[in-house]
Amino acid sequence: MHLAYLDESTKPGPIAIFGAVVVPPGNWGWMERLHGIAIEQLFKIDEIAEKFQEFHAFELFKGEGAFKGIDEDKRYTAIEVLLSAMQGYDFPFIYGAVDEEKLTNSSLAKGLFGMARPLTAAFRLCVLGIEDWARKQHPQRDEAVTVDYKDNYLLIVDDTTDIELKRRLQFTYKVLRAKHPYSNPKPDNNRLWHSHDQMYFGDSVSCLGIQLVDLCTYFMQRHLLKRDKSHRDKADEFFDIFAPNVICAKPEPEWSEYREFIVSHDDNAQARVPQSTHDAKSKGQTA
């Protein structure tokens, strides 16, 4: 089973984004090993238990919090080591992003994606993007969704103290992932055929995958917010490490119906795209 780690970016800005790193079976151990190597770039082994708890993207990049006073070269090397997991083991990074201002000011806000909160809309896009990715790992047929159990995935979301946000995320998941899908009289209600029957929340302190997706989501949002693409900085170099693995979630019908609110890194993102038969839309299913 694939492990899909999800996190939102808390960086202030006009874009609400939820990102996911998918770790295929057999690769988690390599991610943990690289995580350990990254820690060793910053602290002596006998200091780790006392000085290190977790990697926070903003703090690590800016030299704040637990990383205050640590040499920039060491911090940047740690980031490169962490992101090398994306490059070396070909982990996909899937994200959903929406324009907060456009969505908030729109008269369609309440009906859009079935919710009004931009971050919840970004989560919906991201989760559907993971489903689209899972379906594309094996052949599909036009008449129905073909499910391959080797491409099942488990969603592990960074836990939050925002009770209302957590409630909305749980509700969104239950709307997308129908209960008892194989015995449901309306199979079209299920849009997450490859998802585990439950979504879990993890503590980032003890969850390495959440720390990795936090890093990717942070640099993804910086990339989306950047206006002058001709001016490059260190953040661009870090983004380039996992850029080949980046997938903008474009589920249908959301992508076509609400394209003006969705933010994408694709060069031709302004163009409306035709509906794919492999997308995580309402459709029948075959195993």
Locations of the language-model features?
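Phosphate-ester processing/binding pockets and catalytic centers
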Residues: 1-287
